[in-house]
Design a protein with these regions (language model features):
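Extracytoplasmic/periplasmic substrate-recognition and gating elements
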Residues: 12, 16, 22, 202, ...
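Hinge/lid segment of periplasmic solute-binding proteins
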Residues: 54-110, 125, 134, 140, ...
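Extracytoplasmic/periplasmic solute-binding protein
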Residues: 95-104, 110, 134-182, 201, ...
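Glycine-centered hinge/linker elements that transmit conformational signals in sensory
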Residues: 139, 179-210, 264
Length: 278
């Protein structure tokens, strides 16, 4: 979403180098892509090549995925994996030791994006922990502004945010729980769910957040309208600085534009932890 011009450039470059291949493409929000992919795969009508996030979704489609290892060895040699980020490859290695995908990119989730014109207007500093975040959001609300915006209608941003909270509290327990080795009733994980719930009850997230999607309902408010002080999203949103859309250019690069991106200390213990995704 929001990357159409970059995608067009990549497609044009690919077709220039491979004139015998024509690519048919459709742009859609990521959530719609996932739902369509489920239907198309079940019907045997899916694209030959598709992209998904690592983790549960990557494993969910395993019955439809082919081991790419022999193709990669044939094309690039036995040391083909060294061409990719080691951490990204570790996320893609199947339980059988095979690879059913290769990395398209590695980015960080769990960031808070801030439009500093709102902070300057009300004389506020960027919050560094949850207690400060509550106070900042209260000030924004008291002045008729939005607090921290999230498109909680979409499951992926909820998962990204909760994982960031859980990783901030205890990274080892988070990934141990994902592997089924630590129960989700562990006190640190319970605390992460409590903080997540508190974001709604403490007024940190905007009212009605569960009924609003990320792309493009929430992202347009921050990126194109410049009408909200803060939004949760990943590092991939840096592409907005190069977006050719006139509204985005004005918000991000216009006179006086000033945006910050930072990670939150959710449990007030003085440390932060991003969630990584391939």
């Amino acid at each position: 979403p929001g990357d159409e011009e970059y995608t067009h450039a990549m497609l044009e470059k690919f077709e220039e180098e491979h004139p015998d291949i024509q690519i048919d493409y459709t742009f859609m929000p990521y959530t719609d892509h996932v739902e369509k992919l489920k239907v198309d795969l079940s019907a045997g009508d899916a694209a030959d090549v598709y992209g998904v996030q690592t983790g549960a979704m990557y494993k969910e489609f395993r019955d439809f995925e082919e081991d790419l290892t022999p193709y990669l060895v044939k094309e690039y040699g036995d040391d083909w994996a060294s061409n990719y980020n080691e951490y990204a490859m570790s996320l893609l290695k199947g339980d059988d030791g095979e690879y059913y995908a290769v990395p398209l990119g590695l980015s960080y989730a769990g960031y808070v994006w801030a439009n500093m014109k709102y902070f300057d207007k009300y004389g506020l500093e960027l919050p560094t922990n949850y207690d400060e975040l509550k106070e900042v959001c209260k000030t924004f609300r008291d002045n008729g502004e939005y607090p921290l915006v999230i498109g909680a209608k979409d499951s992926w941003i909820n998962i990204d945010t909760w994982m960031n909270i859980a990783a901030d509290i205890n990274t080892e327990k988070l990934y141990s729980a994902i592997e089924g080795e630590t129960p989700f009733t562990d006190e640190d994980l319970v605390q992460s769910f409590q903080i997540w719930q508190n974001c709604f009850t403490d007024g940190v997230f905007q009212d009605g957040a569960l009924g609003v999607g990320m792309y493009t309902d929430s992202t347009d408010m921050y990126q194109k309208e410049g009408s909200v002080p803060m939004i949760l999203n990943g590092s991939w949103s840096l592409g907005a600085y190069m977006d050719s859309d006139e509204q985005s250019q004005e918000v991000y690069n216009g006179e006086g534009a000033n945006h910050k991106i930072f990670l939150m200390d959710w449990n007030n213990d003085g440390k932060i932890a991003p969630v990584e995704e391939a």
